[in-house]
Amino acid sequence: MGEPEPEQIRLKCVRKEGFFTVPPEHRLGRCRSVKEFEKLNRIGEGTYGIVYRARDTHTDEIVALKKVRMDKEKDGVPISSLREITLLLRLRHPNIVELKEVVVGNHLESIFLVMGYCEQDLASLLENMPTPFSEAQVKCIVLQVLRGLQYLHRNFIIHRDLKVSNLLMTDKGCVKTADFGLARAYGIPVKPMTPKVVTLWYRAPELLLGTTTQTTSIDMWAVGCILAELLAHKPLLPGTSEIHQVDLIVQLLGTPSENIWPGFSQLPLASQYSLRKQPYNNLKHKFPWLSEAGLRLMNLLFMYDPKKRATAGDCLESSYFKEKPLPCEPELMPTFPHHRNKRATPATSLGTESQSRRGRP
């Protein structure tokens, strides 16, 4: 007797009417059921889904389970989630969150991403830790973010939503960039993309002025905001609207001009802003204690012209990270046992969704 015929998998085609069959050689194998995981607590919400802390009942490993949100979808998995899954499956770096596998619930539209678990996120730590990070610890964190970004950018991926709440840290001090719901692969030449990305406080000026040509430089602006936030112990540019955000940038860096940012006046939304006349760069006034190397790095990250903005590789070579206080080793980063996500809901299987609120550390 020959081998049995493989079960047919038929998928609905979104762009054309009808269905198509997935050939057996293109299948990755059956996904495990989410019932094989024990839910411990809900720990947050990413761009496109709820995140749980859970235990793999087969291996006892603690993982993060991200439930893919299907709120507005009628024809299957949201394209944003497909992008995130596709990107994460090909990314392997110590400073990028790991997608271990995809598991399914009771219904076809119930999908979970099994991610490597990190004990805390930087946003919660900044809100709750009694003593702010030292400069040596800030350098340790930012170096790890830069290494992860260098890997992403070398693989032609823009994260597009870097912020402290998307930076996770393990109890070994390893920092990992997470939440790739807005990430995009890009090519050369760069294709147009929507400017409505990146959380407002971390949004580069070219995005605020409506550019559709997005490059890795938008991630680097966000790194500058993160570095400044970690050093100052508060957000650098906490705008309440896009107009306010632009004004805060001008107050900090001075008014942009064609001399320092060629093509700036031709950006789609440039004519809609009435920019205050402010000729001074106030970074040194904002960080009077920061070394010349630190200010130089920050200025390179906050260049108005995206083409002149520092790359992740440039930053990794910065003398700021080679002067005292030197970056501490990740293993020597402080631990925060009282800020970890502990069991906040009854332990159950993940067949049903909890209504508990985010368990703040």
Curated annotation (Swiss-Prot):
GO biological-process terms attached to the record: cell projection organization; negative regulation of cilium assembly; peptidyl-threonine phosphorylation; regulation of actin cytoskeleton organization; regulation of cell cycle; regulation of mitotic cell cycle
Name of the top EC class for this enzyme: transferase
GO MF entries: ATP binding; cyclin-dependent protein serine/threonine kinase activity; protein serine kinase activity; protein serine/threonine kinase activity
GO cellular component: ciliary basal body; cytoplasm; nucleus
Catalytic activity: L-seryl-[protein] + ATP = O-phospho-L-seryl-[protein] + ADP + H(+); L-threonyl-[protein] + ATP = O-phospho-L-threonyl-[protein] + ADP + H(+)
Annotated region described as Disordered, given as residue ranges: 332-361
Main function: Cyclin-dependent kinase that phosphorylates the transcription factor ETS2 (in vitro) and positively controls its proteasomal degradation (in cells). Involved in the regulation of actin cytoskeleton organization through the phosphorylation of actin dynamics regulators such as PKN2. Is a negative regulator of ciliogenesis through phosphorylation of PKN2 and promotion of RhoA signaling.
Protein name, per record: Cyclin-dependent kinase 10
Organism name: Bos taurus (Bovine)
